[in-house]
Regions:
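Alpha-helical transmembrane segments in inner-membrane proteins
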Residues: 1-339
Length: 339
């Protein structure tokens, strides 16, 4: 029999899922070339079932070729960043932990900047950003493993160090980049954007995202134990070191995949887990799926604003910062905050 918290958690997860489906339908119709919801449904169904066309070729191109990849990627990136943030906050028992806490984002930024400097294609930029992100976290873990002291503290300190190192490397790449073509491309990538997304980018991101997300969801019952005291968790028969490693690896793969395909989109992994916690509580059994769905809703909503608010598209990383910075201030002013 489910507890009151469990029933509340399931209720909010169902509500969030319905909201996401409604927002998905709305998002397909939004844009410079508006498409009615009824036509959106018919166009999407036509990819599976035989449907008599009642739409124009321009409508189909807008929905399938332009908006579908971008909408899918927005949901994937938003959901995975939120899941990674939730996992990191549980592992480090720190409400201020975010997906970039171990230097994954800084590593991806350096890889992307270097790839642009070397003249790589868009796929090459994505691939090098992903590899560089994983490399940065591998360095963090290697340093923390050799250091003496509390493993969680050593990971945090190593993450700060490696993140600063890769940020410095990115700054140097920007310094030597061609100011006419390469520097603007690097700067725009660092601001984060889903512009020009194609299905190959969605396919590239889907594999590591599934590799990272599925184990996290399967382990969400055990992740709760990482919030306990180290000795208390071990007394319950949990190998905290191994569990922490698995959770960090999964969250790192998620972060690396997200940053590699979308650039720097900050605050999602910090803000959404906190808002989800307000809805369903701190039990990861409900918090992790709720945070994942809520993250998809949030980033899809922000992306809709990004591409429709002005004639010129606003980089999505700027808009998420407008939301995240005030929320960070709110967290700082709370009496019960944990730093």
């Amino acid at each position: 029999m489910r507890t009151r918290e469990g029933r509340r958690g399931l209720l909010f997860i169902c509500i969030l899922a319905v909201v996401l489906l409604a927002l998905l339908l709305l998002s397909f119709g939004l844009g410079r070339y508006a498409v009615p919801p009824a036509e959106v449904i018919r166009i999407l169904l036509s990819r599976i079932f035989p449907v008599t066309p009642s739409w124009t070729e321009q409508m189909e191109t807008a929905v399938i070729s332009i908006r579908l990849p971008r909408i899918l990627l927005a949901c994937m990136v938003g959901g995975c960043l939120s899941a990674a943030g939730t996992a990191y906050q549980s592992v480090f028992r720190n409400p201020m932990a975010a997906p970039d806490i171990l230097g994954a984002s800084s590593g991806a930024c350096f890889g992307a900047a270097l790839a642009i400097l070397l003249g790589f294609s868009r796929s090459g930029v994505t691939a090098l950003a992903f590899v560089s992100s994983l490399l940065s976290v591998a360095l963090v873990y290697a340093i923390a493993w050799r250091a003496k002291g509390n493993p969680v503290t050593m990971l945090l300190l190593a993450g700060v160090m490696i993140g600063s190192l890769f940020s410095a490397c990115t700054s140097y790449v920007k310094l030597v980049a061609d100011p006419t073509n390469q520097l603007p491309a690097i700067t725009y990538w660092l601001m984060g954007s889903l512009s020009g997304t194609r299905m190959n980018a969605v396919g590239f991101a889907a594999v590591p995202m599934l590799i990272g997300l599925v184990p996290l969801l399967a382990l969400r019952w055990r992740i709760n134990l990482l919030t306990l005291d180290e000795e208390e968790a071990r007394s319950m028969g949990v190998n905290t070191g191994r569990l922490r490693l698995v959770v960090i690896l999964c969250a790192t793969v998620l972060t690396a995949a997200c940053v590699a395909v979308s650039g720097m989109i900050g605050w999602v992994g910090l803000v959404i887990p906190h808002l989800s916690r307000k809805l369903v509580g701190s039990n990861c059994r409900y918090l992790l799926p709720a945070s994942t769905i809520f993250g998809a809703i949030f980033l899809l909503l922000v992306d809709n604003i990004s591409r429709n608010l002005l004639a010129t598209e606003i980089p999505i990383g700027i808009l998420t910062a407008f939301v995240g910075a005030p929320f960070f201030l709110y967290l700082m002013t709370r009496k019960e905050q944990m730093l």
